[in-house]
Amino acid sequence: MKIALRVDASSQIGTGHFMRCLTLADALKAGGAQVRFVSRHMPEHLRGMLVAKGHEFIPIKSSPSGTSDDLPHAAWLGTSQHADARDSLEALSDQTWDWLVVDHYALDARWESLLRKTVKKVMVIDDIADRQHDCDVLLDQNLYADMDTRY
């Protein structure tokens, strides 16, 4: 099974997202999966963790396009969702992926639907429920009384 993970991290935000994706990737790899991380922002010490664990890492280069999206956390992406989708597709274009796991507050259904060109299934990890998703599996690790109507 081939699984790609799209997650960013920095010294200010996203390290928790990275760590939960790394934990998932470790378990998937132990089960025989091929795992690739795709990231626009990733500090060297976190990249080092990926390399040490034998995970593939593809950096997405910075893109000149501005953040024109209407999401509350759009600025965290550093570019538009469309530009990021294009760059992510390029990073994954060498093969077909069984799953894409997305853990990013600045990405929504618009981005996810564009990535369906190269992935069979999409899983989104989201714990703030402030945007729509185009996914096969949505994971919110928190317990809420309104979980049935939250998304």
What are these regions (language model features)?
Residues M1-G14:
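Nucleotide-activated donor-dependent transferases that construct or modify glycoconjugates
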Residues K2, D98-W99, V137:
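Structural motif
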Residues D8, R40, D127:
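Cofactor-binding loop segments of dinucleotide-utilizing enzymes, especially the Rossmann-like FAD-
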Residues F18-L28:
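Short amphipathic alpha-helix
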Residues A30-R86:
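Conserved nucleotide-sugar phosphate-binding/catalytic loop shared by glycosyltransferases and other
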Residues L89-A106:
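Short N-terminal targeting/anchoring amphipathic segment
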Residues Y105-L114:
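An aromatic- and histidine-rich active-site surface loop
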Residues K120-Y151:
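Active-site-proximal region of nucleotide-activated glycan assembly enzymes
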